[in-house]
Amino acid sequence: TNIQQYLVNTSKVDFLAHRGLLKSLYGEQHPCGKIVVEEDYHAITPEVLREFYERYYHSGNCSIFLSGKVTEDIISRVTDTFGTSFGQHQQPASKLSFSFTAVPEKRIFIEREDAMQSAVKMGYTTITRNHPDYLKLRVLMTLFGGYFGSRLMSNIREEKGYTYGISAGIMFYPDSGLLAISTETDNEYVEPLIQEVYHEIDRLHQEPVS
């Protein structure tokens, strides 16, 4: 069940570190930083799901995107099939905006005594998809930690041997982007691994990419 899967996840250091990162960057009042607890699953009832479905699953909230060699015949067929109204409501859902505030602490430690390894999550909020530098940032993050031959992998995995895998990427939310670095390592390598991440960040600042 979902509850069982949740309980399994809460025993994993990667899951706990990811939640801790989001909570520390966005705060508990922001949807991204709100931490789900077991009681939240028990509060979900058929009535709650039915009300949610009726309120939000309707043609007023539906958009259709076509790509490729789109002809008038295709548009006509799509319109005939999906173009009619459905659902009990037609009012589009309002788009809410949430402010967020990061905690002042730069490091958050989540203890789990029986853990064989430590999960390391590093990140900060960044630009959204509609920013003019979006594509440039995507290219930079690919170089930094987005594939097997990235700088993080070459240094921290191949050269130093601190981890089997480390990655960096961007997650996008409606009002924010999140740049995150993720890995797991032996407890003894946590500090030197973090220092090497900072070293690679400094390289991006100081050395032109070739």
Regions found by a protein language model. Give the residues of each.
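Phosphate-proximal small/polar/acidic motifs at interfaces that engage nucleotide phosphates
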Residues: M153-S154
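His/Glu-based metal-binding/catalytic segments typifying zinc-dependent metallopeptidases
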Residues: Q90-S150
